[in-house]
């Protein structure tokens, strides 16, 4: 018995629900000017564009990290609240990437608990972490990776900056290259995606791509009805042409 395949195509549709926590590095190395106007301000601009491209039904939270990590905005659909928090970010010493992941996971878990108390199923969650440096304080990245895997939350990472970034600390020029390897490892081992950006424009594109990946999903769509309508139209056209040709012969 031969079965006929149903004609279909793939369409991109906004996700009904999802939870995203954006974790951003605000360590002093983000003052480096290898990215114009500097890493910090370029990050702020690109992060706000990421906020704008996410579908409105996605809950978005914001975590900042330097020597410690802080949840500035719990997951919410209030985009203005997140954008305002990005505008008000401040720089500080040290880089606690591991703590940023743990804090982001806590934000996700708290939000999921709230959803469950309403009798609803928690939506899928993801962390999007941007950094330019190496973990220097707090819990190790390996511990954070284990926690993210246990929670089933992928961590997508963005390595931002060049190998030639420097920082002027009281007259001393200090190199601040990007630690790509550790950020790539976090993404690989948690099931997230890894991206690099060495300019403001590249960072904006990375965030735009992530927004598209996270905010939308590809779904098959049955187009058999279109084929049926098209087939009927062709058949009717054939009948009309046949009648016209017959009339010419008579």
Residue ranges of model-derived segments:
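C-terminal signal-anchor/stop-transfer transmembrane helix together with its immediate cytosolic
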Residues: 1-14, 212-250
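Short beta-strand-loop
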Residues: 14, 58-91, 102-118, 167-183, ...
């Amino acid at each position: 018995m031969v079965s006929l395949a149903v004609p279909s195509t793939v369409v991109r549709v906004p996700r009904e629900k999802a939870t995203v926590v954006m974790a951003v590095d605000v360590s002093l190395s983000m003052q480096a000017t290898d990215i114009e106007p500097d890493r910090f301000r370029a990050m702020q601009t690109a992060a706000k564009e990421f906020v704008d491209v996410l579908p409105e039904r996605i809950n978005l939270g914001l975590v900042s990290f330097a020597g410690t990590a802080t949840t500035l905005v719990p997951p919410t659909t209030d985009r203005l609240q997140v954008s305002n928090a990005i505008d008000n970010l401040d720089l500080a010493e040290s880089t606690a990437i591991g703590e940023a992941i743990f804090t982001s996971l806590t934000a996700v878990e708290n939000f999921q608990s709230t959803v469950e108390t309403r009798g609803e199923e928690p939506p899928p969650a993801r962390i999007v972490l941007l950094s330019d440096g190496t973990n220097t304080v707090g819990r190790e990245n390996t511990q954070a990776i284990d926690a993210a895997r246990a929670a089933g939350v992928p961590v997508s990472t963005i390595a931002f900056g060049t190998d030639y970034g420097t920082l002027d600390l009281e007259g001393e020029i200090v190199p601040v290259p990007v630690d790509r390897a550790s950020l790539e490892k976090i993404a690989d081992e948690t099931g997230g995606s890894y991206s690099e950006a060495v300019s403001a424009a590249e960072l904006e594109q990375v965030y735009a791509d992530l927004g598209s990946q996270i905010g939308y999903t590809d779904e098959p769509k049955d187009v058999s009805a279109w084929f049926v309508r098209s087939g009927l139209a062709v058949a009717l056209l054939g009948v009309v042409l046949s009648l016209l040709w017959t009339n010419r012969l008579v």
